[in-house]
Every structure is written in C-alpha cells, then in structure tokens.
Amino acid sequence: MTMDFQITRRYPCSYLPGELARSRIVVTDDTLSDSNTYAQLIQQGYRRSGSLIYRPDCDYCHACIPVRIPVELFDPNRTQRRIWKRHQHLQIAWHPLHFDPVHFDLYQRYQKSRHTNGSMDQDDENGRKQYRDFLLKSTVDSFLVTFHENEQLRMVSIIDRLPDGLSPVYTFFEPDVPGSSYGTFNILWQTAQCRADRLPYLYLGYWIANSRKMHYKANFQPLQYLIDNQWQYRTTNR
C-alpha cells in the first residue's frame, strides 16, 4: 500500500477562538485497513474521524499535543474512584458500528447541549449523514459501546482497537443528568478494558493547555505527551 500526505487549507480552529488551523491528512492508494500501519500513525499523533486520518499541521501554533495513559501506571484519584463506584450498575454492551435512531437522538441532544448552532446538531437527513460519516465509517478495527441504566441509554462510545491499546474516537452521553460524570467514567472504563486485555495504552487524542474543553485529560495521571516525536512525561500537566 502506497501512503502519502496532504496539507489542507487553513480553517477556523475548533479549540482556540480566533486562530486558524491546518491538518496533515493521510492519502492512500487503497483502503487503510492494516492494524499495524494504523497503530503506527496513532503512535505518531494522528487521529481518525470517519475515513479521514489526520493530525494538526499549523504554521506557528503547536498547541495540540497528543496524549495517552500508560494504563499499568494509572492511579485514579479519590474523585475518580467515587465516580467508578457510582456507575458500576450501568449495563455495558459491545456492538459493531451501526446506525440506531436511539443513538442518534442522544447524539443530537448531546450536541445541542454542548455545541449549540454547531455543524453537528442538525436533525434532518443531512445531520444523519454527517453522523454516519463522522462516527460510523471506518476501515479499521472499530466498535460501538452502549451504556444503559434501567433500560435507558445513557452513553455511547466509538472506539478503535490497536495492537498496543484503545483509541476512543468519540463519546456522547445523556446531557440531562447533572453531575453524572459520565465522561470521566467512560475513560476509567476504557482504561480498565485496556488493562483486562493487556493493552498498554489508552490514546486520548489532543491536549491543549489553553482549551477548557481539553483540561479534563490532565486529570488522568500519569499522562504521556508526544513532544518532538517522543512520548514523554511532563512535570506540569495543567
């Protein structure tokens, strides 16, 4: 398989208001389905969105830093341990990627609560197409996980499996349960899955110091950062 890379045009940054971003995208002459090749790209800081594999390649900004949890060293804090215990009653099931109207309804409500007037909160056919393209298109080893409470859907995760870990693509959850901490529980659960499957890393995507949306990732310690093409620890994570 021949693999090449292209640089996109500049576009408004999703995380830092007023900034312009660019991405380097993977271009292949065939469908990228080899797990080892995909794992190498993830290890180099790439992420997946639908069939698109990319990493930031901005002119002057280097704020997007790939991070991962070394699961054997992960030490949950007191708050995380409480959240873990609180949600042990959730019914969790693994599925192949598929469209379900109940999942889509939860996704829409989550988007509208978090990203009002965003490009992903459309409830028409175009919105369903964006949902499928963003979450349900994959040529790698991907699966969908549902979390139910008393037969009510509470959370959905799309996750890629790698030879050396798990890489969550996207998670959305019930926005009308205040203080649920579903997102924190989800990372704790994925960390536990890595440990159970003897996978050393949970890849969390990008951490950005000046983005409040990304601050939660620094709550999971220790955390490794990809800096100058080397995975390393930092003495200051916040």
Swiss-Prot record:
The keyword Metal-binding does not apply. One of its GO terms (biological process) is ubiquitin-dependent protein catabolic process via the N-end rule pathway. Signal peptide: none annotated. It comes from the Bacteria. It is found in: Cytoplasm. It catalyses: N-terminal L-glutamyl-[protein] + L-leucyl-tRNA(Leu) = N-terminal L-leucyl-L-glutamyl-[protein] + tRNA(Leu) + H(+); N-terminal L-aspartyl-[protein] + L-leucyl-tRNA(Leu) = N-terminal L-leucyl-L-aspartyl-[protein] + tRNA(Leu) + H(+). Keywords: Acyltransferase, Cytoplasm, Transferase. Pfam families: ATE_C, ATE_N. The keyword Zinc-finger does not apply. GO terms for cellular component: cytoplasm. InterPro entries: Acyl_CoA_acyltransferase, Asp_Glu_LeuTrfase, N-end_Aminoacyl_Trfase, N-end_Aminoacyl_Trfase_C, N-end_Aminoacyl_Trfase_N. One of its GO terms (molecular function) is leucyl-tRNA--protein transferase activity. Its EC number is 2.3.2.29. It is an enzyme of class 2 (transferase). Belongs to the R-transferase family. Bpt subfamily. Functions in the N-end rule pathway of protein degradation where it conjugates Leu from its aminoacyl-tRNA to the N-termini of proteins containing an N-terminal aspartate or glutamate. This is Aspartate/glutamate leucyltransferase. It comes from Nitrosomonas europaea (strain ATCC 19718 / CIP 103999 / KCTC 2705 / NBRC 14298).
